[in-house]
Amino acid sequence: KEIKYIEIVPQNGRYTMSIVYNNDLEISPNQSTDWISIDLGINNLCSITSNKFVPVLLNGKPIKSINQKFNKRIASCQKKLKSNDKKSSKKIRSLYSKRGDKLHSEMHKISSFIVDLIKDQNIGTVVVGYNPEWKQRCSLGKKNNQKFVQIPYMKLINQLQYKLLEQGIELIIQEESYTSKCSFMDKEPCCKQQTYKGNREKRGLFITSKGVKINADVNGSLNIFKKAIKNLEQVVQDELISIPLNTGLVMNPLRVTLRTDLSQIDQRSILLKIKINTPMVFNV
């Protein structure tokens, strides 16, 4: 393969080398009209909805656990440095690097699992939500700021982007404002409203104007998809939006935890479980 360029970047007392090469594979665009939509969060790292299978919630607690483990060790080192009026040390820089490496590895496992799911289900359209406040760190609250900033969402999105291109699929990145507040079931436009049709009664639960209970992250994921297809050609838009609005909505998400030691056999069993859990629907 022809090397395009090599990049060497100093980072936390060490050097990281990236090699970028040209991929000469001839890739045909995926023509499938089936779709998935991904909402990124904290406790549910990825909330995946589709017209092919029940919603899948990827557990985000293992990522939180990694951050908490390293944050505790970093805080302990920083406390010892205070007496010497120092703010950093070789050990602290090493901990930051190790945390980054660990999260980078976990994001690869998660993105690879999602791509395998997409290939397994022959999905042609993939949408992921994006929140500019992940970088701006505004109006999320002190605790949420820290949690969101320490989860490398853009790394996950970038990995999905290039892995999907190899499958002939272009990832649609959709700004996600108001997708968690507006009711997908009530066909409410995803924009600021004087009065919202639905509401979040408690954490993880969204209730529509008709009193229908739905997982809050599932509602957000479907709204992200609804916002994204407005930017597509009208013919494609009509074909895609007719699927979720006409068939109804799945009520019981399938919760999946990707262990650090997940084997190929374990992954295939999870994909099979998703495949046999076809949507249980009700009329809107």
Region locations from a protein language model:
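Substrate-contacting helices/loops that form the catalytic groove of nucleic-acid
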Residues: 3-5, 11-157, 235-284
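Positively charged, low-complexity nucleic-acid-binding target-recognition regions
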Residues: 145-147, 151-284
